[in-house]
Structure formats: structure tokens, C-alpha cells
Amino acid sequence: LKIMSCGLNFADILLKNGTYQETPQLPFVLGMEVSGVVDAIGSNVTNFSIGDRVAVFGGQGGLAEFGCFDVSRCVQLPQKMNFDDAAAFQIAYGTSHLALGYKAQTKPGDTLLVLGASGGVGLTAIQLGKLMGARVIGVARGTEKMEVIKKEGADFVLDSDDPDLVSRLKDLGGIDIVYDAVGGDQFKSA
């Protein structure tokens, strides 16, 4: 695959530091969010052709000019999707969809609290939460980030540095689902 775009995921940083839940065999190339153009194919590959635009789901090797990926991890890109969006789409949306759709079983009318709402995973949680019919409360640090999450559709936006954050959340009513896109002290308070 001629790599056209690769996202740098937090898991890549953990892998680099040796603190990820799985430890790959050394040496390895970071980069698990990848999109590109098929440059060559193996003799048993029948569902892709040279020149196809694809995204690769999972694995490593994206922070390179070219990479060799198992065909089972590759999907064709829609014509309207650019390479950057394709690389960023996979893990952020996949993580939020798994958490909100399968684990939390989000349904219309639920109140969803998204901590770390201005990052890639947090923004996808806002979007998917709204699509699932939830009332979404987004929490982020600072005015600029708060404006971003409001534009993405959060019904309520709160600053994580607000010393009265917990009381402001209580004023908004009950919370059915807490989605923590970052981890840390806020989750304990929530």
C-alpha cells in the first residue's frame, strides 16, 4: 500500500513507550490508522486491484511511505472520502460506536455526558450520541474547545476547569451514560 495518510493515535504513543495492553515484537513501525492506494497485491488477492483507494483497520506500519497489510484488514474507500478522513475515521468512530451502541446501548432520551469531548474520540461520541437520540453534555477545557464541541452538536457545554462542574452537572438533571474519552479525575467525579 502506498500510504497517503496516517493518524497518530494515543495507542501509538503507548506502544512506543511499551505501556500498551499488547506489546508487539520488535522492531515494529507505528501507525495504526492508515489509508492509501494499493500499489501491489499478492497472488491470492481477488477483491482489490492496483490503484484502489483503501483504509486499513488495525495493526501497525502506517508511519512509512509503503506498507504491507493483510487483505482482511482493508476496505475500499467511498469516492467522496478523502485519505485524511479515512485514516482518522476508523479508531475514533469505532471506539465510540462500540462504547455507545453496544456497551451502553444508548437510546433516544438518554443523557450522555462526554468527558474530553473536544478530542477525536470525544467528538465522534457527540456525533453518534446525537444520532442515537441522546441529550449530550460535552465537557472540555477552555473556551476554544468548548466552541468546537458546541458546533459538533452538544446540547450543553461545560468547562472542565470550572470548580463548580459537579453542581452544574447536577443542575442539568440526571446522567444515564458517562463516556470518558481521556481518563483521569473527572471520571471519578462523574
Predicted region positions:
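Glycine-rich cofactor phosphate-binding loops and adjacent beta1-alpha1 units
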Residues: 137, 152-190
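Short helix-loop-beta connector
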Residues: 49, 79-84, 105-111, 173
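Mid-domain Rossmann-like dinucleotide-binding core that forms the NAD(H)/NADP(H) cofactor-binding site
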Residues: 87, 93-163
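A structural motif shared across PLP-dependent enzymes of the aminotransferase-like
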Residues: 58-71
